[in-house]
Amino acid sequence: MNFRRENRASRTSLFDGLDGLEEGRLRASSSYAHDERDNDEALENLQDRVSFLKRVTGDIHEEVENHNRLLDKVGNKMDSARGIMSGTINRFKLVFEKKSNRKSCKLIAYFVLLFLIMYYLIRLLNYIKG
């Protein structure tokens, strides 16, 4: 009888171990489901971040395109202004190459200077009176 008791005791301990293994398997599957749920949440967060980055990238691209158009317009206007300035400089060169033109330019400059002096004197007199 002692042998049967020992046999039953060893059998019980043997099956208790299997019960523990089966529970472990259940725990493993529960842990697997938990890990899957965590992975799904992480994937959703990643998708949200990717879509956010995609929107930001689109906004940046649109802003860059707007700035490129603006820079093109500014560049075209600068080229136009450069052309006008070079034409004006060429005309001044033509005027100052001839002596008669040089004399008339000096005369005009003296009149402009005289006009400015008179203007400031009149303003000064009005300031003193007022």
Curated annotation (Swiss-Prot):
<feature type="topological domain" description="Vesicular">
    <location>
        <begin position="123"/>
        <end position="130"/>
    </location>
</feature>
<protein>
    <recommendedName>
        <fullName>Bet1-like SNARE 1-2</fullName>
    </recommendedName>
</protein>
<dbReference type="GO" id="GO:0000139">
    <property type="term" value="C:Golgi membrane"/>
</dbReference>
<keyword id="KW-1133">Transmembrane helix</keyword>
<keyword id="KW-0333">Golgi apparatus</keyword>
<keyword id="KW-0653">Protein transport</keyword>
<feature type="topological domain" description="Cytoplasmic">
    <location>
        <begin position="1"/>
        <end position="106"/>
    </location>
</feature>
<comment type="similarity">
    <text>Belongs to the BET1 family.</text>
</comment>
<keyword id="KW-0472">Membrane</keyword>
<keyword id="KW-0931">ER-Golgi transport</keyword>
<dbReference type="GO" id="GO:0006888">
    <property type="term" value="P:endoplasmic reticulum to Golgi vesicle-mediated transport"/>
</dbReference>
<comment type="function">
    <text>Required for vesicular transport from the ER to the Golgi complex. Functions as a SNARE associated with ER-derived vesicles.</text>
</comment>
<feature type="transmembrane region" description="Helical; Anchor for type IV membrane protein">
    <location>
        <begin position="107"/>
        <end position="122"/>
    </location>
</feature>
<dbReference type="InterPro" id="IPR000727">
    <property type="entry name" value="T_SNARE_dom"/>
</dbReference>
<feature type="coiled-coil region">
    <location>
        <begin position="40"/>
        <end position="82"/>
    </location>
</feature>
<keyword id="KW-0812">Transmembrane</keyword>
<keyword id="KW-0175">Coiled coil</keyword>
<dbReference type="InterPro" id="IPR039899">
    <property type="entry name" value="BET1_SNARE"/>
</dbReference>
<dbReference type="GO" id="GO:0005789">
    <property type="term" value="C:endoplasmic reticulum membrane"/>
</dbReference>
<keyword id="KW-0256">Endoplasmic reticulum</keyword>
<dbReference type="GO" id="GO:0015031">
    <property type="term" value="P:protein transport"/>
</dbReference>
<keyword id="KW-0813">Transport</keyword>
<feature type="domain" description="t-SNARE coiled-coil homology">
    <location>
        <begin position="33"/>
        <end position="95"/>
    </location>
</feature>
<dbReference type="GO" id="GO:0005484">
    <property type="term" value="F:SNAP receptor activity"/>
</dbReference>
